[in-house]
Amino acid sequence: MRAKDHNRSIDADWLSRAFCYEDSVVKPLRYFCLALALLPCMAHAAPELNVGGLYDYLEEGKSTLLKRVRNGGDSTAFVKVSVVELVYDGSAAPREVPLDGLALEQRGLVVSPARLIVPARGMQAVRLLYRGERDKERYYRLRFIPVLPELGDGFAVSEAEAEQYRDSLKAGVNLLAGYGTLLFVRPDQTRYETPIRRQGGALTVTNQGNATVVLDHFRQCQAQDQVCEPATKHHLLPGRTRKFEGQAAKVHQFELQEGSERKAMVLEG
């Protein structure tokens, strides 16, 4: 199914670009820190991060969110957390505004701690605190990047400990994988209004509210829950319209998510 983009709507393609480490990497945002290959016969202990969901939503009236970072590997993970604000001003791609170099009082979103030491088979948590204005919806990208610790880089390890850790990873061909997640900060007085129209097989969805809506498990089927295409997920920002082509003999089926509300949608015509 081919989708036409109207008014530069934000969808999974935009989110892929927003998450990319180098504007060409798509989910799950693998970041090669040491090597390009991992040979099973040469594999040694290495960290394996799991940051949970790639999308988080800070609803109206809430200012904090706890995000858990798990390490399923056999080696301790030293993780740096970086934050950029994604400013969508009508261009083809969002503009990135780094927050890491700003003074604490100038940051709309504060991540604490910004350095994590996650033990093997263990878990640590980061606290997201939003302190900025909520006159409109705002968007932030967080990067969780495993690194080789160095003296004085905030991990409070000695030079000998850092060298020992580096040597343990260099013993084989290892891969350190980093991940990016996206945070949606809802505005005050959040309002949802999402008219949906289907005609001649084409589905048109418009977001007339002031917060992003999600079309989850989106697919076209021969009939409800029968012979369906692979499901996709689309985020539609306020003021945007998205048109999906389709066949009149088939149905569009998805879950419309407006904040905490969920609506099962099956559309014909």
Regions found by a protein language model. Name each.
Residues 99-133, 226-251:
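Intrinsically disordered, low-complexity Pro/Gly/Ser/Thr-rich segments with frequent PxxP/GP/PP motifs
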Residues 46-75, 189-198, 233:
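Beta-sheet-dominated interaction scaffolds and their linkers
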Residues 193, 197-269:
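Intrinsically disordered, low-complexity segments enriched in serine, threonine, and glycine
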Residues 40-42:
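N-terminal signal peptide c-region/cleavage motif recognized by signal peptidases
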Residues 69-73, 130, 203-211:
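Asparagine-centered strand-capping/turn motif at beta-strand->loop junctions
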Residues 131-190, 252-269:
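Terminal connector regions
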